[in-house]
């Protein structure tokens, strides 16, 4: 059995978790939810797309080296990755942002973490109450686009926040058949969990997202929600991700062009990780 926290590919998922006073959290939440979130969704996406396109410019490749020096302990961090498909080098910062592993991690566990980042929320589905979003009362099922009661109450809900420094491709946590793909339009409010002290998963209830269900060999559904945030030019699914298609554990499910969080409702519970710890792609779930 793999010990907790093994970094088989040394992905370095760690970043500073800010502890801010309540008044500042309230201010940031107001700016994110009320001011920015009050703008029409199309305007939010247009501004985010413009912001994202800036990082596609060739001059932004010169950001990569100082960015690595600032955020990563390994000065050769970039050497562990490949540029996106069809490119031979990192020609822009966006290319680095959507980098690919040269070698995917190897795990003997039947289920793994699908992404890299901070596990900012975790617990049984029935332990979560309701959230009020634009005068609507919403439950955990709202995130995944299903009706209340569709997800077994003993399932485990997790939310992993991906910092800008994190690897931004989402992988299958288990082998199985894709039994649902759903796109939910929405806002693009700020994702950083420390500004939503009592409800770090609030953005997942209202932001644009793709929901993907994977049914494993025991007939159990693993619910995934790939949630966008400000600056997201787009969320893309590989052409191989199709309804009724089969995926192997760690097959790629989606990638983000800047900013994201990944929620999951699973029949299994994490063995080695708990709220406010860091997880890595391929680490034992």
Label every model-predicted segment.
Residues 1-285:
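Contiguous, well-folded functional domains in the mature portion of proteins
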